[in-house]
Amino acid sequence: MLDYGEQLLLPLPHQGIPELRQAIADHLAAFRGMTVDPENILIGAGTDFLYNLLIQLLGRDKIYAVEEPGYGKIRRIYAAGGVTTVSAYMDSAGVLPGSLGQAQVLHISPSHHFPTGLVTPVSRRLELLRWAKEGENWIIEDDYDSEFRFDAHPMPAMQSLDAERVIYMNSFSKSLAPSIRISYMVLPGHLMELFRQKLGFYSCTVASFEQYTLARFLSRGYFEKHINRMRKFYKNRRNRVVSLLQSSPAAQRFTILEQDAGLHFLLRVETQLSDRELTGRLEEAGIRIQALSEYYHQGRAEDLHCLVVNYSGVKEERLEEMMGLLPEIL
């Protein structure tokens, strides 16, 4: 960092340093099919901070549709920000446009939905973009975890299909490390102008040292090499988990619902236990895992007998032990 000298001590541009914004724009062009003006990129310390900026920018009078099932924290962030949320119901192709009702903002993870792993096909994406354009609505594209597809190239981002109605969000916390609290969003040009007028007084929340380091990591190709290594590592980890399940004495009671996206998969289990009993017994055995039914907010789905298997944080030596306990628990 000696190369930057006194620059590290200067006040930060409110949107983040130009070097990092340019590096992110280049990365998005190469890997997500997006043509992005670095001036439309905003850097922040974590997506929670950026979501709160969006609430202020779009207005608290808006109704936000959130995927059902979905990541519960998103709904809590919006509620804490004072906005009304409704459920965006899904079928096998993703969010149903007809379920959006009076919503004016849709929060969606089309390239890797959590917890189902669903990848929204182009036809459904175009339907949702039509909903946004015709109603002058907004789509917040949460692209978290999209780097980790193992057997196919990632589908281009929705933002690449319509840069005027889509707000793109992503973070480096999963692809690098949770302690690296660097996230960013790409705003449509006219929305960025409004941001500068309305919220441009906010200071950038990421230290200059971290920004310059990440900018160099991206621009010199180290991030791409890192992602390729991690894809290989996690693919081997996934294959190990799948192999243990398939060789288990209870293998005939397991169905792996594979979507080739992200760092988890759904495991359907044949059992007489309720979801609550099943996850409770697993926790007693030292296996902390959630059922798919826990991710429903409205019209809660009971006893789907699907477990959300997140294998990214499990130590290799624990995998065989955990898989060996499953037949006894069931």
Can you annotate each of these PLM segments?
Residues 187, 266-272, 289-329:
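Conserved PLP-binding active-site segment of the aspartate aminotransferase-like
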Residues 189-194, 223-224, 272:
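Short helix-loop capping/hinge motifs at secondary-structure junctions, enriched
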Residues 196-199, 220-242:
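Structural signature of PLP-dependent enzymes
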Residues 246-257, 269-271, 295-297:
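Cytosolic nucleotide-binding catalytic cores of signal-transduction proteins
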